[in-house]
């Protein structure tokens, strides 16, 4: 089973790392939106667990891991406390938000793809759920914060594409029986680096043909 590429301890640690980094990005956005402490916690939890909850419900992994492992619930609360007390320092580090988000994107797209395949889905469906695992929490985060989700906006740097690449790499490795801890890590790093490069060089997906690039919808 591909979900057992790593020892249970390593796999659980990677899951918590992904949850933590996504929760940080959600909590930081909540602070920028002037949410109270409860709102910060809610946005952190939703960002960290939303994509995984959707994946588990689709593949029939019920109850979802977020409801059976207390660590999955407590980790976003730890991120909430960290941001709540240290946000004046963290908020000045915009690159930190981007790095946290990119790291979570890479970790979740790989974990989501392998888990979906282990539950009997085909490679294409598994890759799609890997993408959903990676971006689902971010979409919910943006919606709750009253923002158009980043992956839907032309005037935002590539967000879904790096996750698509990472998920596709995992699916191809499974297809050719080449999925190992090394290739899984390579997929994580690829998605992570692509997201950071997109932020650095402002890579964006094309809009409808003949749509004037100078026209940007209101924020």
UniProtKB/Swiss-Prot annotation:
Membrane topology: Multi-pass membrane protein
InterPro entries per record: Gly_transporter
Primary localization class, coarse: membrane
The organism's place on the tree of life at top rank: Bacteria
Coiled-coil annotated residue ranges, if any: none
Cell compartments where the protein resides: Cell membrane
Family statement drawn from the similarity comment of this UniProt entry: Belongs to the UPF0126 family.
Annotated PANTHER family: INNER MEMBRANE PROTEIN, UPF0126 INNER MEMBRANE PROTEIN YADS-RELATED
Protein name (Swiss-Prot/TrEMBL): UPF0126 membrane protein SCO5481
């Amino acid at each position: 089973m591909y979900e057992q590429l790593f020892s249970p301890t390593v796999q659980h640690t990677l899951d918590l790392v992904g949850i933590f980094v996504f929760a940080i990005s959600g909590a930081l956005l909540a602070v920028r939106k002037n949410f109270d402490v409860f709102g910060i916690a809610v946005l952190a939890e939703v960002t960290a667990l939303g994509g995984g909850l959707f994946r588990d419900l689709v593949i029939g992994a019920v109850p979802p891991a977020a409801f059976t492992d207390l660590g999955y619930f407590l980790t976003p609360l730890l991120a909430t406390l960290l941001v709540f007390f240290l946000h004046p320092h963290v908020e000045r580090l915009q690159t930190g938000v981007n790095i946290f988000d990119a790291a979570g994107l890479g970790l979740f797209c790989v974990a989501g793809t392998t888990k979906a395949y282990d539950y009997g889905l085909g490679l294409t469906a598994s890759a799609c759920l890997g993408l959903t695992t990676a971006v689902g929490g971010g979409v919910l985060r943006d919606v709750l914060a009253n923002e158009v989700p980043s992956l839907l906006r032309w005037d935002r740097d590539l967000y879904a594409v790096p996750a698509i690449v990472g998920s596709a790499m995992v699916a191809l490795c499974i297809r050719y029986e080449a999925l190992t801890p090394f290739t899984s890590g390579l997929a994580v790093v690829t998605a992570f680096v692509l997201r950071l490069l997109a932020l650095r060089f402002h890579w964006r997906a094309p809009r409808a043909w003949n749509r004037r690039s100078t026209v940007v919808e209101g924020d």
